């Protein structure tokens, strides 16, 4: 690492991903289960509300990215606004509604606020990292620091509620979670403010005219539509178990006390194996390595489908294996997308490419949340209650079998893309990913 990219600057930039990821876990995993269990929110209603909220969250990403480009000179102010919006929404969710008669409206409003703030911060943090340095090796280093801090944030968020609930009530534990978030975000906003005040981005987005062009739909439906389709199917496969992991652990495995341990194993595995996937990609290239990770995920889902009720040891192994696959899913889609942007000389609309990639997991969450909760409600499943063997079997099918099928489809599409595009593109993507290709 040279003097142009020092550790203090990497920490000031990357640390912000820690409180951001910390907030993301309760938003996308804990809160739906909390409101179903503690406030009696009907699963069909919850599924419908989540479907609408996730769609709003997904659709607004390209708009927020476009607006952030137009006010790029006010990036610090944008970060302040995003932080305040996220904090307000998360506080409302963690402290709960003033009365149960407004639970649906309270949950909906707070989720919209929180997810909007989360999107603003995520888009701008990724933009800053992507355009901080021109050098590809530097960009990979920057992304690695950001993702490492993010995984630490996820790990802390997984542990805090479980530890807090050993001494506090469920609601009090989430109040404690918000307090921890406030401390971490306070540190994060100070560091990122200092970073923005002392750091000049080396890479320009393009001319004002290029920035004003709204190319989101043409990006998704253009030459790279097969790549985006692979990502979308893969994200749905990952979203379903992420949404159902809490009821699965509590109502199928009957091991609610071990939830924090399971989540910790998952995120630790993701962090540990990220370096492993990076090394493998040096030999195989990013596409082939991602395909191998697909196979790991498929085998993991097969194993999860065979779990018996109360099989905590087997599920711990599933958590480690699925976390291993998580590292690849975090690493390779952005790396492959960078290769596409560079190959097609589309740097001027790079922000919108990343907005498109950010849109897909949120759209996947919308479909997964709406579909799974509505299906569970159809069979009479009740979160945190005594459910029949049939209802638990449906939960198992949704948690393991459906994602296994989807991941198999995603792997098939990726295999088709590799054969269709040929090994020339694979070599190009490997070179761009590792920073060995330079513009002539």
Q: What is the predicted role of each segment?
A:
Residues 2-435:
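Membrane-embedded alpha-helical bundles of multi-pass transporters/translocases
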